[in-house]
Amino acid sequence: METQIHQLEQEAYTAVLRAFKAQSDAISWEKESLITELRKELRVSDDEHRELLSRVNKDDTIQRIRDWRQGGASQITRHATIQPFDVLPSPTFSAARKKQKTFPSYNPSIGATGNRSFNNRLVSSGISGNESAEALIGRKVWTKWPEDNHFYEAIITQYNADEGRHALVYDIHAANETWEWVDLKEIPPEDIRWDGEESGVALNIGHGSASFRGNRRGQIHGGRGRGPRIHQPRRELVPPPTQQNGSGGRRTSSDDIELFNTDSLVKEVERVFDSTHPDPLELDKAKKMLKEHEQALIAAIARLADTSDGEMDGDPPYSHDHPMPQG
């Protein structure tokens, strides 16, 4: 009976794909969000999706409609912002939006970006030229995530001129900080709001953190190009036991050992490796984090060994008057 139920679920999902394909070879953000939810509710896996989509593409009726459309028949454009339909077979990852390395510093240049007329031009016609794009650094922006229809606040911190993408940082400077590279021209005007913009639209502001949204994105597989991102665990400063040195001084902050939170690191790496279709970029980041953590542990052990040798040479033993910091 369970097999029959799942067959009905696949038939329903296929019917929706055929209907969307019949309408257009392109898909709007709204349709993509709907398909994402259907995949979850109808229990359609990534492999099943690819197989069903392949069947739809080979369907004789769909092919006739496609030929008719390409033959010059009038086509009603239902949505202004669309993307190729065939990106859906692997919705888990997208080159458009992936979390990158932590930015070492954040120095917003608000004064250079407070031009509201430029802001309006950006939303309606995109960015023209590197100078205008870089002027957005430091701006506050809200973007809508299709899966919950909420807007989330981010700060634009960098611009990659080669790829034409801006870095959006959510929960900046917080322990759960997350970020993504975005081509702002790909975001529909109704899905983005700018600080100071008098749009007359009441924002449905989300109260969840960006890290929660990143994890949720990884679970439902899809949405507006945001793939599951590897969330770099927070580093913790672990001071060695305090000791008196030869001149009676205490240790300095340079004596602290900086390590990733091991539990968080292991969980994050497991999440990346356990995904159905791991992203090579995310795998590479996970390997680099593990290697960095390994090197930090080796360095910490070496420093502890040096300190222990100092005790054997006659230095006073450690005093334990400084508690370990709570993560």
UniProtKB/Swiss-Prot annotation:
Residue span, ENT domain: 1-88
InterPro entries per the UniProt record, alphabetical: Agenet_dom_plant, EMSY-LIKE_plant, ENT_dom, ENT_dom-like_sf
Basic residues bias: start-end ranges: 214-232
GO biological process: defense response to fungus; vegetative to reproductive phase transition of meristem
Domain of life: Eukaryota
Compartments reported by the entry: Nucleus
Modification type Phosphoserine: residues: 308
Gene3D superfamilies recorded: 2.30.30.140, ENT domain
Annotated keywords: Coiled coil, Nucleus, Phosphoprotein, Plant defense
Basic and acidic residues biased stretches: 318-327
Entry coiled-coil feature ranges: 32-58, 281-306
Gene Ontology CC entries for this record: nucleus
Position of the signal peptide: none
Role according to the record: Probably involved in the regulation of chromatin states. Contributes to RPP7-mediated and basal immunity, especially against Hyaloperonospora arabidopsidis isolate Hiks1. Regulates negatively EDM2-dependent floral transition.
Subunit-level organization: Isoform 1 interacts with EDM2 in nucleus.
Protein name: Protein EMSY-LIKE 1
Native source species: Arabidopsis thaliana (Mouse-ear cress)
